[in-house]
């Protein structure tokens, strides 16, 4: 089903509750609490919020998983090649990636597709921001 995003673009979302969600082995990865998300980024004078572009769609699906994620449209059947929005495992899979991006970085916190970076001054802030951006580049996330 098409969903209108806040920026006016359209997100295609399958309703997987009636197809694969009930037989899916759901990935287990804890979602962060508010304290986990915001504690690392409290007290900074300078703040950057990165909103990852089409977050889930940056994750390539394994070939053998693609057959289970076919959607039926008025134009025919289409098979996802990247992690779709709406599958029960998608949030945990993507949060695990976000957590690995932030692991070991100072003054960085994030949940889902939002990553926050702080610094006490411009120099510290830009150093923290560059560290986060470099980690994202090395992991192929934008």
Predicted regions and their residues:
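Retroelement reverse transcriptase polymerase core
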Residues: 1-142
């Amino acid at each position: 089903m098409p969903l209108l995003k806040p920026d006016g673009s359209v997100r295609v979302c399958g309703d997987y509750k009636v197809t694969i969600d009930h037989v899916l082995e759901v990935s287990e990865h804890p979602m962060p609490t508010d304290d986990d998300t915001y504690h690392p980024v409290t007290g900074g004078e300078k703040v950057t919020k990165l909103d990852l572009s089409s977050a889930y769609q940056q994750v390539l699906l394994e070939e053998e998983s693609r057959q289970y994620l076919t959607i039926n449209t008025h134009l025919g059947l289409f098979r996802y090649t990247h992690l779709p929005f709406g599958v029960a495992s998608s949030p945990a899979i993507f949060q695990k990636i976000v957590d690995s991006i932030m692991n070991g970085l100072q003054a960085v916190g994030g949940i889902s597709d939002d990553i926050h970076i702080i610094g006490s001054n411009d120099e510290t802030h830009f150093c923290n921001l560059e560290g986060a951006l470099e980690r994202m580049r090395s992991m192929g996330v934008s």
